[in-house]
Amino acid sequence: MIKLSLLLSLASFTAVLANQRPRCQRCPVSSSKYFQQNNLLGSRFQNEVQRLCARRVREESSSESSSSSSSEDCSRRRRRPHREWEDSCSSSYSSCSSTDSCSSSAPCPPPVAQRCDIELKTPIILMGERIYEFLKNYEDQYKKAVLLFLTNILSQISGFNPVFPGGDYDALIEQLKTLGVTVPANTAAELAAIDAAESSALTRAIQANAQKVISDLLTRVSAMCYLDIMSLVNSGLLASQVSSVFNNIQPIITITGNDLFAKQMAVFQKIPGTLPSAAITAITNALQGNRTNFVTFFTTQTSNLQTSVQNSLTTLISELEKLATDTETAFTAFANAEISALISRIFPTSTTSSGSGDSTGSGSTGDAGDAGDTGEDGGDDEGTEGTG
């Protein structure tokens, strides 16, 4: 009976341990009282129970302290065999902690895509900038030449200030006196004043008309891009618009000459009494001659201005054509050098392929094969890693 009771007690003790093992860390060192009070084992097993519970408490305490220094995933892997736990946990912890590698003050390394930009993207961008600067410089020169031409035309127009010399009125007055006409003493001065006034008015009219046309053209060209300016020059529109400055000048000169004649005739009409027909003929012939001289004078002056402007326009077009031709030649050489530099950088074998013969081709094939093998190995590694 004693043996049977002992076996039953041992079986009960084993069952209790099986049910309570997950919560063994809660057992105090004096847990043997629980078994003693329930008369499960007897006093001779108290020391063994105390030893088991104390060891379990130490193990669980050690497990909790170690889990606080690693990730939760690492603590779950702790029940694996030692080597498997060490390999998987260390790699997992490395992957977990790698996300925090940029939190320190040290700068993170650039991504691979950015580091590889220096091979292709950066050289192309720099080449594009150099080409842009080359062509932009040409466009600026072209535009500045046209603007300078128009500015010089404005300067010539502003300097257009011819002074009509006027007629010889003293001779006319002497002739009238011989015909018995009493002429006021200030008649010659009054006629000369009319000449000066009409001359000045005509000069201002010519200047105002020309300045308006050229100033408007200068304002429009200043706001244009190169292609529009080039089209304006090559189509002949620039030349026609500049020439339009002089299209309406001749009618203005003619009208002003007629006004001059009418105003000077009015001076003699103020003379009291009836003038003899010979005096009227002398006055008419003298004033008509003065009008003709006035029109001829200003026609010549404006023609000289027009010729000067036309010569400047011809010089401008010639210089622009020369600039375009020279720049095109220089740009072709410049662009070829830039492209050659890029080709030798990206395709270094192509520069030596003519001299290398078949060896160059085989070398390229070998490199490609190696690259292909590397890519396949990389794929296998990723597949294995994913399976694991």
Curated annotation (Swiss-Prot):
GO terms for biological process: sporulation resulting in formation of a cellular spore. It is found in: Spore, Perispore. Residues 373-388 have a biased composition (Acidic residues). Residues 350-388 are annotated as: Disordered. Glycans are attached at N290. Keywords: Glycoprotein, Signal, Sporulation. The keyword rRNA processing does not apply. It comes from the Eukaryota. Coiled coil: none annotated. Residues 1-18 form the signal peptide. SWP1 is a major antigen recognized during host infection. Component of a complex composed of at least SWP1 and SWP2. Spore wall component. This is Spore wall protein 1. It comes from Encephalitozoon intestinalis (Microsporidian parasite). The gene is SWP1.
